[in-house]
Each structure stands twice: as C-alpha cells, then as structure tokens.
Curated annotation (Swiss-Prot):
Any GO CC annotation of this UniProt entry: plasma membrane
Keywords, in A-Z order: Aspartyl protease, Cell membrane, Hydrolase, Membrane, Protease, Transmembrane, Transmembrane helix
UniProt function note: This protein specifically catalyzes the removal of signal peptides from prolipoproteins.
Protein name in UniProt: Lipoprotein signal peptidase
Compartment(s) of residence: Cell membrane
High-level lineage: Bacteria, Bacillati, Bacillota, Bacilli, Bacillales
Similarity section: Belongs to the peptidase A8 family.
Organism from which the protein derives: Bacillus anthracis
Transmembrane segment boundaries: 55-75, 85-105, 124-144
Pathway: Protein modification; lipoprotein biosynthesis (signal peptide cleavage)
Length: 152
C-alpha cells in the first residue's frame, strides 16, 4: 500500500538527516540558513515536545507501540477508501516510528530544525516531528471540510 511507502520515506529521510547531524555537528552548534529565521542546530531531547516528560523512555516506548498499532489498524480499515486520510496516517506513522527509533537506539531524540517565528524562539524539531504535525493538520482540515459538506 502506498501509505506505508510514505511512512518508509519519512523514516528514511528522518534517520538520514539525524545521522548527518550526529556525525557532522557538535551538540549545541548552529548553522544559519536564513539569519534570524532558520538554523540547523544540533540538539537532543529526552522527552516529548518542549521537553515534556523528560527521561520517561518506558512511557514513550509503550505509548508509541500502542499508537503505531492503532495507526496501522486504522490505515487498514479506512485508508483504502480515503486517500487523504491514508496519506495523513502514512506521515503520522513515519514520524512516530522515526522518533521511536531514536528513543530505542539513542535514548534521546535528535532535533535540528530551529526556527524563529516573528522573533519567537520555537523549540528545535526534526523531520519526524514535521511529518507528524503535517499529518495531523491534514486530518483536521479534512474533518473540517467534511463537516462543512455535511451541513450543506
């Protein structure tokens, strides 16, 4: 199924990018891409977004396995008839597994995309995080559009 290919693509790009960061950058160093907007910054996270639940690896292992099983089940049941849902779930699955790999093999997640949005120093993130967020946003958009169609 194409949605699993999307997940594998996300995992591959995520892991390759993280490997490049670990091998080529000292922890804490930063390379400006667009001054005051976008940087590549070598960072590690032992928790979830914004460092929430730091050092609770077993919690993340269990939650991720349950979540991945749920996503695969949901993909098998609903993605056959809904392409956008399948793409969204493929992105979410790839992102979840990408960060899970880091937690299992590194006991931390490698983050490196550092963005300043209107001078707000946004937490450093990675490709897996981006895929998760894009997948969730697509599901929200689809849900809103379907709700609008139902009302009409």
């Amino acid at each position: 199924m194409i949605y699993y290919v999307i997940a594998l693509f996300v995992i591959a790009i995520d892991q390759i990018s993280k490997w490049l960061i670990v091998k080529n950058m000292e922890l804490g160093t930063s390379i400006p891409i667009i001054d005051n907007v976008l940087y590549i910054t070598s960072h590690r996270n032992r928790g979830a977004a914004w460092g929430i639940l730091e050092n609770k690896m077993w919690f993340f292992y269990i939650i991720t396995v349950v979540f991945v099983v749920f996503i695969v089940f949901y993909m098998k049941k609903y993605a056959k008839t809904d392409k956008l849902l399948g793409i969204s779930l493929g992105l979410i699955l790839g992102g979840a597994i990408g960060n899970f790999i880091d937690r299992v093999f590194r006991q931390e997640v490698v983050d490196f995309i550092h963005v300043y949005i209107f001078s707000y120093n946004y937490p450093v993130f990675n490709i897996a995080d981006s895929a998760l967020c894009i997948g969730v946003v697509l599901i929200i958009i689809q849900t809103l559009l379907e709700g609008k169609k139902t009302k009409e």
